[in-house]
């Protein structure tokens, strides 16, 4: 794939994913609407802004592996109700973040740093979303990926593609706690 995204294919896939967001659960984080799931991945990203698609791509890849995963694109606040119904024990948010690191760098970001120098590439306040998510579970992790570019485009850089694959493998193996902290 090497990060090449086709906007028309993304749109068609998005329709399918929207239909399956609530009903598709499985893998080691199996859940249904009346059962609590262990881990829910919330991917944030804009597929039309190059590397900014990273969080969404991670969510989609993990969904294919059977994880309870939501591709919230750039509107995570719209999925609070869905997340609440899943009753996750832990929420892992994946997003591109400006961290002044080399492109493709992956870091776990302490939630208190979101108010400080850490900025996601979206206009919505991630701190407000996290505050709402804390009402669901206190176990929230933010994984940030340093983008190379967030200019309008449909190509994810090689560095960020590698980071996406690293995060998918790490979460699949249950080793997200081993990611370096910012």
Predicted segments, located by residue:
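N-terminal catalytic or cofactor-binding beta/alpha core of small enzyme domains
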Residues: 2-148, 154-182
């Amino acid at each position: 794939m090497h990060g090449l995204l086709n906007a028309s294919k993304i749109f068609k896939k998005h329709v399918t994913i929207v239909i399956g967001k609530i009903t598709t659960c499985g893998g080691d984080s199996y859940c249904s609407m009346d059962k609590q799931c262990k881990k829910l991945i919330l991917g944030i990203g804009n597929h039309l802004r190059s590397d900014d698609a990273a969080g969404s791509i991670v969510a989609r890849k993990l969904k294919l592996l059977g994880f309870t995963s939501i591709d919230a694109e750039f509107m995570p606040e719209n999925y609070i109700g869905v997340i609440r119904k899943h009753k996750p024990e832990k929420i892992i948010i994946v997003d591109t973040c400006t961290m002044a690191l080399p492109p493709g760098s992956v870091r776990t970001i302490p939630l208190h740093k979101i108010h400080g120098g850490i900025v996601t590439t979206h206009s919505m306040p991630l701190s407000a979303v996290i505050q709402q998510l804390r009402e669901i579970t206190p176990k929230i992790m933010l994984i940030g990926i340093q983008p190379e570019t967030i200019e309008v485009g449909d190509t994810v850089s090689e560095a960020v593609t590698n980071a996406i694959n690293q995060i998918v493998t790490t979460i699949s193996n249950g080793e997200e706690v081993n990611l370096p902290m910012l």
